[in-house]
Amino acid sequence: MRLSQVGELGLLAELERRGLAQRIEDDAAQLGDGLVVTQDALVEGVHFRFDLVSWRELGFRAAAVNLSDLAASGAEPEALVVTLAVPTETDVEDVLELYAGLNEPGVPIVGGDTTRAELVALSVTALGRSERVPGRGGARPGDLLVVTGPLGASGAAFRENRLARPPLRLVEGRELARHAHALLDISDGLAVDAGHIAARSGVRCVIDLERVPLASGAELDDVGFGEDFELLAAVVDPSGFAEIGRCEAGEGVALLLDGRPYELGGWDHFRRA
């Protein structure tokens, strides 16, 4: 069986089944005493191209996608650890620009590694502390589904041959974490990520697509592209965040447009969902 057949989630399930990794349920791992840790990698030709992004923007993006996982954990960031693989002919000034971007969010870089590679690859580990991590598995029938901002920016940018700048939702994440029953960031597309809440919580997520706020220039199908890095939460009180749906008894995700079923795509690292 190949990765293209099972996808990322299938691989994770097989690792868990064989006892090779603990069950991976949330955006960041909880290590006790409120410490949470997450890691994401960006690989040239897979996640970015230098005709679409500068070295500085790449650095910011690498920090931001990891901080998004901390935001989904209601965490206050404390440190970043950075591993960089680059060709030997890379200009030193380009690497300095990359690190300038990594430093933009204001989280200290406390360690890492640098090594040689044919293409650029960047892996960031982010550490933070959270008083309460809602996770993905606590949503209940009757909960409302809310998002922290407009969706579709990344998909719209891709259609225009560019990359969107990820938002930082750390403040919103800490606010939502105080009372949300489930919380995650939208990195794989709205339908896919709502499906994570539905599967872990044992509920059916019903999303009214006409209520989903769209980013400037975005079309509805862009919401399925992923990499918006807004937060999706299941709550009792929307607290001013955009309400886009609800949780019901049942399973799976129902996407409705004017009351009729609608399909959105989503992202899987080894296949399109």
Predicted segments, located by residue:
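Glycine-rich anion-binding loops of enzyme active sites
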Residues: 42, 76-155
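Active-site glycine-rich loop that binds ribose-phosphate moieties when present
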Residues: 124-135, 159-175
